[in-house]
Amino acid sequence: FRCLNSTWPEFDVEGRSGAALPTTEWLLHAIWQRLDPQLPLKSLRLYEQSTLWADYLGNSMEAFLTIRSHFAAAHRLAREELSQSENEAIYGKCARPHGHGHNYLLDVTVRGEIHPRTGMLCDLSALQQLVDDQVVEPFDHTFLNKDVPFFSTCVPTAENIALHIADRLKAPVAELGASLHKIRLQESPNNAAEIYAEAAQV
């Protein structure tokens, strides 16, 4: 193991004017700068841990930061105006009257400029707290159809849940100085929904 602050000139804040702090975002940018002259790079991803990573596409100081959270919830896929047989024809077993549950994995990706002083796109602790307050706490261990008012009139498919999460997060993320880029909600090993917030105009 090596300390980046002392072994990479880019992060020698004591000995070099203009050096940066070795945040995940800045480290990814520095790696790009080192590799770009030798490789035709399109994108780079750097994991700090399994629940936090950054992406860089070579666009000046713009980068993407993703945090992963999870929650457990139950739901039933059915429209009230349809019969049980009609709902089962559309949603299959997911329309059964008493619902079923999932352990959801939630990836929240924000986009922004790497700040020259902090080396971050936004306050990471504030972003995590925002996701906890706006999504995890209100959704965890609930029956979405009955416990989350939005889903009393909207079928809680993975797509609709992801869209609602994007709607809840877009404005608060902007207040942190970043833009909500993407929501990825994994419902099961073979089923996930992705919402690109800017394209969806939530």
Would you name each region that the model predicts?
Residues 1-202:
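Charge-rich, low-complexity N-terminal segments
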